[in-house]
């Protein structure tokens, strides 16, 4: 309530009245909730279920951030010429396909399927992230871009935190107090 009435709020809640700003921030937090735990789940599968060492797991897992780092700059430039929301939507569709590939993940899931999933997620997230941030930043007046940037960071941290919390609760419910060890 104090922030709403402040002349110079630390975090301007009023920005969320802007539908484009709100929807793009919701998309951001949902994307982090959906994708942040993938590394933990796949790494646990590799090391504790399949018995891979951490180096091999890391080499496979680098697929996602590597492809994201390659695609994101191009997607950012493209989003200056084409509707960024369309690019971001295509990116999230690709991420969703990648996540669906991991639904049946177990000890017998082909590494090719896991790599395809990570590749799709990296490409999709690369297509999503920069255009979505472009949408958020361009949806506010120039004087509010510092606040919009804070919102982007807040959604990222909140999404990652919620993602980890949800995974922890799921692990606790499904496994109880069992010690996780390589098989």
Write out the residue ranges for each language-model feature.
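C-terminal membrane-cytosol helix-exit motif in multi-pass small-molecule transporters
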Residues: 1-5
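12-transmembrane solute porter fold
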Residues: 8-178
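Short, membrane-exposed interhelical loops at transmembrane-helix boundaries
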Residues: 182-183
